[in-house]
């Protein structure tokens, strides 16, 4: 997908870029039966308290029901449209199954309108087909990877991402997969994945250009703690510019901000990680 550049008519437009969807999407309107109303909580919980900062004020949008399970086995489907999805970085494509049902899936790189895809153990190794990891050969690039059999895809769903199958255990229970982050981990061989990479890989190259675009996306400004008042942040207060005044930087809630590990030490999935992403760099 091509990157569109703008003439510097204003300071905000000067470095702005966007994706040229005109020549890459089919231009169809979304299927109404697969749309749901998406409420914007603006980072508040049921008590109205802020639980996630810097959220709120985005444009209204509908949620597209995306099929992450791909459990409609051995029924061929045809790609009808490739559409924009405002809720994710990847595009989505509409599948029309032979029995009349329609479902959205994440659009893989290189998929075309009119292409046939299928799910199931006997599916061919073709971009867009979904099958268990045990049936996919080593070296294949995959996306939409399940963590638990039948639980739906959790890994490699963003634009341009993929993972690679490195090998399989001797007993055939686990498959070794290398993720985009560099982490190498074992995943149950009964879990499903989709062949190929996620499309729209140039999404990360887009320069929003101005703060107003982020406001449309629901991203509010991030204010430094050192310019707040003492009642709002441990770094706040003082006459003019002041240092932190503590042994180490703190979060707004008074906990140490830097150098503290945030992953649970007794997490059950630790034994499945063969190489941490931080060790891979």
From Swiss-Prot:
MF-aspect GO terms: rRNA binding; structural constituent of ribosome; transferase activity
Transmembrane segment boundaries: none
SMART domains named in the record: Ribosomal_L2, Ribosomal_L2_C
Keyword Repeat among UniProt keywords: no
Coiled coil: none
GO cellular component: large ribosomal subunit
Domain of life: Bacteria
Record Gene3D superfamilies: 2.30.30.30, Nucleic acid-binding proteins, Ribosomal protein L2, domain 3
Keywords: Ribonucleoprotein, Ribosomal protein, RNA-binding, rRNA-binding
Ranges where the record places region Disordered: 223-281
Biased composition (Basic residues): 261-281
Listed GO biological process terms: cytoplasmic translation
InterPro entries: NA-bd_OB-fold, Rib_uL2_dom2, Ribosomal_uL2, Ribosomal_uL2_bac/org-type, Ribosomal_uL2_C, Ribosomal_uL2_CS, Ribosomal_uL2_dom3, Ribosomal_uL2_RNA-bd_dom
Keyword check for Signal: no
Sequence similarity: Belongs to the universal ribosomal protein uL2 family.
Subunit relationships: Part of the 50S ribosomal subunit. Forms a bridge to the 30S subunit in the 70S ribosome.
Function (record text): One of the primary rRNA binding proteins. Required for association of the 30S and 50S subunits to form the 70S ribosome, for tRNA binding and peptide bond formation. It has been suggested to have peptidyltransferase activity; this is somewhat controversial. Makes several contacts with the 16S rRNA in the 70S ribosome.
Name the record gives this protein: Large ribosomal subunit protein uL2
Organism of this sequence: Mycoplasmopsis synoviae (strain 53)
């Amino acid at each position: 997908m091509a990157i569109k550049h703008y003439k510097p008519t204003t300071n905000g437009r000067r470095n702005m870029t966007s994706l040229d969807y005109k020549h890459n999407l089919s231009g169809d309107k979304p299927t109404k039966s697969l749309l749901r109303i998406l409420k914007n909580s603006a980072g508040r919980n049921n008590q109205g308290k802020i639980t996630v900062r810097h959220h709120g004020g985005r444009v209204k949008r509908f949620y597209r029901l995306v099929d992450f399970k791909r459990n409609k086995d051995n029924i061929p489907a045809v790609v009808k449209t490739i559409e924009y999805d405002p809720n994710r970085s990847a595009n989505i494509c509409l599948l029309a199954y032979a029995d009349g049902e329609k479902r959205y899936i994440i659009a893989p790189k290189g998929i075309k309108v009119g292409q046939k895809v299928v799910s199931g153990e006997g599916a061919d190794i073709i971009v867009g087909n979904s099958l268990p990891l045990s049936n996919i050969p080593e070296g294949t690039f995959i996306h939409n990877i399940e963590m638990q059999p039948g639980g739906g895809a959790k890994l490699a769903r963003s634009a341009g991402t993929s993972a690679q199958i490195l090998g399989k255990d001797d007993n055939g229970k686990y498959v070794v997969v290398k993720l985009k982050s560099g982490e190498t981990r074992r995943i149950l061989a009964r879990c499903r994945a989709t062949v190929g990479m996620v499309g729209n890989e140039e999404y990360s190259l887009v320069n929003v250009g101005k703060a107003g675009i982020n406001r449309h996306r629901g991203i509010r400004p991030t204010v430094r703690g050192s310019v707040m008042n003492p009642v709002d942040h441990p770094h706040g207060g003082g006459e003019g510019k002041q240092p932190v005044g503590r042994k180490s930087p703190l979060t707004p809630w008074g906990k140490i901000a830097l150098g503290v590990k945030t992953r649970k030490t007794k997490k059950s999935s630790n034994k499945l990680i063969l190489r941490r992403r931080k060790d891979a760099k």
